[in-house]
């Protein structure tokens, strides 16, 4: 309580709380909840970044080509074109970016590549399981063929264990590049995979002959 004189000389009492109201404190448990919520959001953010930059399994293709049996990928010995073989999981959303990057690559090299798509389907299903937007888009790519790949056997013969993986063969049937053609999961844009393949087809020395693959495991 504060006492002050008025102009008339009388003494007036002033309530300080009325002049400066007391600030209400935030309950400690609300502060803890806010901190925990912030930590959770930060953790999820960094987890998504880590997931997007985590490559799937991949191995080099055999130098002599795949073992011959009905599921194997075979090349025509008379082919004078470079060939790109891609492993595709038709239900993998990350593969959309790989298909888009492939189409960008084909524009860069004036469609000098023939393409073969090994489209995965589980062993207990028929080839209808492959139907969908991704397979439909693949069917519209020029100079391309689609092969049903039961349980991913043909892809794995070439070391491809992740959707979006590619192997590029020169006209003599020798594998010259293997890996992915995106910089991370579901990411489109300039990347070393597309750049390296493009340089190979121009007769230049690429910076890499292998890159990480980002996509769903077959």
Tell where the protein language model's regions lie, with residue ranges:
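The canonical Cys-X-X-Cys-His
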Residues: 92-95, 166, 216
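Structural microenvironment flanking redox-active thiols in thiol-disulfide oxidoreductases
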Residues: 96-138, 148-157
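Cofactor-binding loop segments of dinucleotide-utilizing enzymes, especially the Rossmann-like FAD-
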Residues: 89, 118-122, 171
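N-terminal targeting signals for export/organelle localization
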Residues: 1-70
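Short active-site neighborhood of thiol/selenol oxidoreductases, capturing the structured segment around
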Residues: 77-102, 112, 116, 197
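Thiol-/selenol-based redox modules, centered on thioredoxin-like
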Residues: 168-170, 175-176, 180-218
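A short beta-strand-turn-helix
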Residues: 60-82, 101-107
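Short, internal strand/loop/helix patches
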Residues: 134-170, 175-176
